[in-house]
């Protein structure tokens, strides 16, 4: 399955469900309490993050999609913190604030990137919450997908009225289910239980074949459009009536924290479907997004650039010819892994042994080598009529095939100052007998603390000489 980045900016989504605040107390631990055999944490940072349905909305907004949220909170500072965080992220939130009942808060005590303790502040909402019919109707008018984010905390008690209202308007409904009765999600377009939640409903599955059979039966029983079972390290399984099962392997490189991974899955699915992607492609994107978010600590969202970079890696564009946006994402990813970026540029009209040796030496100055290539018009201006011999596409393709070269990009100007200002390499390399101050762009690179190096050229290796020899013969 070939993945591509959707137009999330044209994909409005409404989330309705159980909102909560994820609060983190960070601190150091250096001793055991004299009162009990437990560590003493000296708290030096308090951090609030939207959780539950609020995290789903936050993830949707982080991808660049317009997000709206309806939920239930108390009338307290936790609700204010949630509202402020969501507003800062661009999420439109409508809260039903209930007096004398606390906003749900999950407090985690953290030390050295480890969770030592979780404390929950919550009381299930016993009243008939979400009596926000007018607000729901109003917000449904402008969205392309409705998400029901159900954590079983009492905010969602009218599943069917929401599902039917959305279906009447032709709006797909995605539900992240909870509890022992999935009939409340009857008629949904897609539900996304994890394996444990799924087996609570259908019974234990001995193998994949049994999972598929029981899942297909559940689709029929509940009139569901599709079922996506998330299976942790075993990936995901998508089931649709009349279609073969689609199994996707897990994509995580490293797993630090699975908190909120399900939120990331349904938010990416919702945004992708709202953007017009078909379900298999949306599931592929959600699987990729989940692999990113479990590599983060705590409840977290992934951004559009992070997802775009993961798609590039998945589709094999980790190396080769890139556009500027792709290149900047690739550089961000490399720097996140403490890799040094080297930059060189030239026409590279007829690639010869001198070029190859020079590029190998340039690559040795760091971890990643960018080769910026003059486009055809700029080569003609620099070298005169009849040049280039090879088009820019062919020149870049040959350069991209060299083991020393990571990324190749073209530029239209005669010199690469504009590109250097955006790329900001750690090392600028040029071949020849220049002084460092004579290297074009040296002032830019040195201005932000980068390094400029001049490498000697291989003798008797010149594109111009090769061209003249060909012409004479």
Curated annotation (Swiss-Prot):
Residue spans crossing the bilayer: none
Molecular function in Gene Ontology: ATP binding; heptose 7-phosphate kinase activity; heptose-1-phosphate adenylyltransferase activity; phosphotransferase activity, alcohol group as acceptor
Stored SUPFAM superfamilies: Nucleotidylyl transferase, Ribokinase-like
Chemical reaction(s) catalysed: D-glycero-beta-D-manno-heptose 7-phosphate + ATP = D-glycero-beta-D-manno-heptose 1,7-bisphosphate + ADP + H(+); D-glycero-beta-D-manno-heptose 1-phosphate + ATP + H(+) = ADP-D-glycero-beta-D-manno-heptose + diphosphate
GO biological process, one term: ADP-L-glycero-beta-D-manno-heptose biosynthetic process
Keywords on record: ATP-binding, Carbohydrate metabolism, Kinase, Multifunctional enzyme, Nucleotide-binding, Nucleotidyltransferase, Transferase
Enzyme Commission numbers on file: 2.7.1.167, 2.7.7.70
Gene3D superfamilies documented for this protein: 3.40.1190.20, HUPs
Active site location: 263
Residue stretches in coiled coil: none
Residues at which ATP binds: 194-197
Pfam families: CTP_transf_like, PfkB
Region span, Cytidylyltransferase: 343-473
Pathway assignment: Nucleotide-sugar biosynthesis; ADP-L-glycero-beta-D-manno-heptose biosynthesis; ADP-L-glycero-beta-D-manno-heptose from D-glycero-beta-D-manno-heptose 7-phosphate: step 1/4; Nucleotide-sugar biosynthesis; ADP-L-glycero-beta-D-manno-heptose biosynthesis; ADP-L-glycero-beta-D-manno-heptose from D-glycero-beta-D-manno-heptose 7-phosphate: step 3/4
Domain of life: Bacteria
Region (Ribokinase): 1-317
Function: Catalyzes the ADP transfer from ATP to D-glycero-beta-D-manno-heptose 1-phosphate, yielding ADP-D-glycero-beta-D-manno-heptose.
Assembly and interaction partners: Homodimer.
NCBIfam families documented for this protein: cyt_tran_rel (TIGR00125), PRK11316.1 (NF008454), rfaE_dom_I (TIGR02198), rfaE_dom_II (TIGR02199)
Family assignment from sequence similarity: In the N-terminal section; belongs to the carbohydrate kinase PfkB family.
Name under which the protein is recorded: Bifunctional protein HldE
Organism, as annotated: Pseudomonas putida (strain W619)
């Amino acid at each position: 399955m070939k993945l591509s980045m959707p137009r999330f900016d044209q994909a409005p989504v409404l989330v309705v469900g159980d909102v909560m605040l994820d609060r983190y107390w960070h601190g150091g631990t250096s001793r055991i309490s004299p009162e009990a055999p437990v560590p003493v944490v000296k708290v030096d940072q308090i951090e609030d993050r939207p959780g539950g349905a609020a995290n789903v909305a936050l993830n949707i907004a982080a991808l660049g999609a317009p997000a709206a949220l309806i939920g239930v909170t108390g009338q307290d500072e936790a609700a204010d913190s949630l509202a402020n965080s969501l507003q800062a992220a661009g999420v439109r939130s409508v809260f039903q604030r209930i007096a004398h009942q606390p906003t749900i808060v999950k407090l985690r005590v953290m030390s050295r990137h480890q969770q030592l303790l979780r404390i929950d502040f919550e009381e299930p909402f016993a009243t008939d919450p979400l009596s926000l019919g007018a607000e729901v109707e109003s917000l449904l008018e402008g969205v392309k997908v409705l998400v029901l984010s159900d954590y079983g905390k009492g905010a969602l008690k009218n599943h069917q009225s929401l599902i039917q209202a959305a279906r009447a308007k032709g709006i797909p409904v995605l539900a992240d289910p909870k509890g022992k009765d999935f009939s409340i999600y009857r008629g949904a377009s897609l539900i996304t239980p994890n394996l444990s939640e799924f087996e609570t409903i259908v019974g234990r599955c001995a193998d994949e074949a049994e999972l598929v059979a029981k899942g297909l039966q559940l689709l029929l029983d509940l009139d569901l459009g599709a079922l996506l079972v998330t299976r942790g390290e075993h990936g995901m399984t998508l089931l649709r009536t009349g279609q073969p099962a689609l199994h996707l392997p897990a994509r995580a490189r490293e797993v630090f924290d699975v908190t909120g991974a399900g939120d990331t899955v349904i938010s990416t699915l919702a945004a992708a479907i709202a953007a017009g992607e078909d379900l298999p492609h949306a599931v592929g994107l959600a699987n990729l997004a989940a692999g990113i978010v479990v590599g983060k600590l705590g409840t977290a969202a992934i951004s559009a650039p992070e997802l775009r970079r993961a798609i590039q890696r998945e589709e094999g564009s980790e190396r080769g010819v890139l556009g500027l946006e792709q290149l900047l994402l690739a550089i961000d990813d490399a720097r996140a892994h403490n890799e040094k970026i080297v930059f060189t540029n030239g026409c590279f009209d007829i690639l010869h042994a001198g070029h190859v040796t020079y590029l190998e030496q340039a690559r040795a100055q760091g971890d990643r080598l960018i080769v910026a290539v003059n486009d055809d018009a700029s080569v003609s201006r620099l070298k005169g009529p009849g040049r280039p011999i090879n088009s820019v596409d062919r020149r870049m393709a040959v350069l991209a095939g060299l083991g020393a070269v990571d990324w190749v990009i073209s530029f239209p100007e005669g010199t690469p100052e504009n590109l250097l200002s955006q790329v900001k390499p750690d090392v600028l390399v040029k071949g020849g007998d220049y002084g460092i101050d004579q290297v074009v762009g040296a002032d830019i690179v040195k201005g932000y603390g980068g390094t400029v190096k001049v490498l000697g050229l291989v003798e008797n290796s010149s594109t111009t000489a090769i061209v003249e020899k060909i012409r004479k013969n």
